[in-house]
């Protein structure tokens, strides 16, 4: 189930990839490719620009989750993840990263 309210989230799910056509269908974009499957299968759009990332909120298993596709290169993904984790007060053990 997906929601649109602005309440807190308990988990961050971060789909890592690199911007640009050079990496579009490579293993370096495994996280982005996984996010595309999640969007299709769950009917969610990860398209709200926030925290240097495309984001969407979802409720999965009764837990509020922020889905993130950082719009930085993988090596700089902390620029997106750290502010989101701080804003929502999500501890590191509640951050799931999907990458190659």
Residue map of PLM features:
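Nucleotide and nucleotide-moiety/phosphate-recognizing core
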Residues: 1-99
């Amino acid at each position: 189930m997906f929601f649109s309210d602005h309440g807190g989230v308990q988990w961050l799910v971060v789909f890592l990839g690199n911007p640009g056509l050079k990496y579009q269908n490579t293993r370096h974009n495994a996280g982005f490719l996984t996010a595309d499957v999640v969007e299709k299968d769950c009917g969610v759009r990860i398209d709200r620009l926030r925290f240097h990332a495309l984001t969407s909120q979802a409720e999965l298993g009764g837990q509020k989750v922020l889905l993130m596709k950082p719009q930085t290169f993988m090596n700089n993904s902390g620029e997106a993840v750290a502010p989101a984790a701080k804003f929502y007060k999500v501890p590191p053990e509640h951050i799931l990263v999907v990458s190659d």
